[in-house]
Amino acid sequence: MTISSSPFHVALHEAKHSAFGTSVGFSVTAIHVAASQGHVIWSNNFPVPEELAWLWPRNPEATTTLVRHAVATLLSPHDGDQFPTLCHDSILVAQFGRAWYGLPTVRGDVPMPWLVLLRQAHAAVRSWYQQPGVACTLVQLAHHLARAGTLDAQEWTALWQCEYGQWLRQSTPAGASTPPMPLRIDTRS
């Protein structure tokens, strides 16, 4: 994503994406931060909108959770608020919305209204961001990313496990569980 700001602001943006996504179970392949742009490359467990029609009939509950987590990950740099301008993140959220609206009723399972799912994603980001230590830890992570420039999966995993994950993990209510993520098909070839 191109951001008109300092390398630190770019790094903070990407830190929020990568930390929130990792906290809900997505795997990072690489993180790139440059002077005016950055991006996170996700592994195959981060969904793409084109997969929803295939995933939904197989496991509607897990697909709903997967999409909520993916959309929240895209919203995370904005702290749960609306996108200030049109950007790659907002375009991808809109693509998820279009794909979601096209899902059929399956065995009585009706996709929840998109705006409800979107509100839940916004609320999840706000709740995560307000956990003790998250905002400060994200700033520290952003400084690390700005200095490093690029992290591969192994470097990110080491950082997450040793330094940042303890503060940035999602708090889960006792007894709560997350449905298993559906198997992913490769639709990009």
Kindly label every feature range from the protein language model.
Residues 2-189:
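Soluble catalytic regions of large protease machineries
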